[in-house]
């Protein structure tokens, strides 16, 4: 092994989303400092081309399906590319990555991008938690993307305090600002009028994101258009709900957009009604771009926005409708919240802090 041997970043998805975007930021930042990476994951997502454009070697691997052949292919990949460390992201990738690292005799790091176990019925939940506890025994370090997540994981005994490192997900503020469209262009891309009030959200269309709350809030407060950027299993249900509530004309579903934050300048307010998050990267991106944010009062949102915060609400459609209406009606309040968010993102959630922490972690594990 030498210092030019790569680190493998293993993903369970290459769709546009927080995990793949995080890995892209890490690869872009640490390659400039001399690190080499291989990214492996499903080959059908739009982020694949983003990685390749960044000069990252991408190997298609169906980590979103459980098969012994995938594990065998992963072990062969680690050996063929002389991978010196495996860093996995997400459930399926965490299973494959840690088992393959063990078989190939290289250290394993795993990042939890949220602890989403509640959706499983009782027996399946117990089985999943038991599996994570066993996998922790062959994991050198567990990275938690927020302090709230670390506390929850420790309470569930998914890892030990000695294994855990908290590395807050950060965004490349300068790159984000440079790639964002002007307000006029962003609105044109989304088919929005310059004069209308716009609330936006970018998320996977999954039940845990509770995008239905935002649709219901739009029905309760007729003064704004709602833009949802993303895709997922809840898409059809959200469209039906909008039609039932009479807000289909005010709903824009933009679909899956790589680097969706480029379009955030189209929004007057960014909203997140998620029931649970690891660390909400899209919220951090909105903050970095100086947007006011209205979000459900959950630990991850409190951690990134700061608490107390005027943008936090109790998570009901009525609470969202009321707060969104008040923020949209007050340009001074929007400007102040946006400025506070930008300052907080740049001081506490900039990618440079995250990259330094991960570089230190990799160096420590590899004895560099």
Predicted regions and their residues:
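Short hydrophobic beta-strand element within catalytic cores of glycosyltransferases
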Residues: 40-41, 292-295
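A short, active-site helix/loop in glycosyltransferases that binds the activated sugar's phosphate group
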Residues: 138-165, 171-175
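Conserved acidic donor-binding segment of nucleotide-sugar-dependent glycosyltransferases
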Residues: 306-318, 326-332
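A short helix/loop element that forms part of the nucleotide-sugar donor recognition site in Leloir-type
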Residues: 177-192, 333, 342
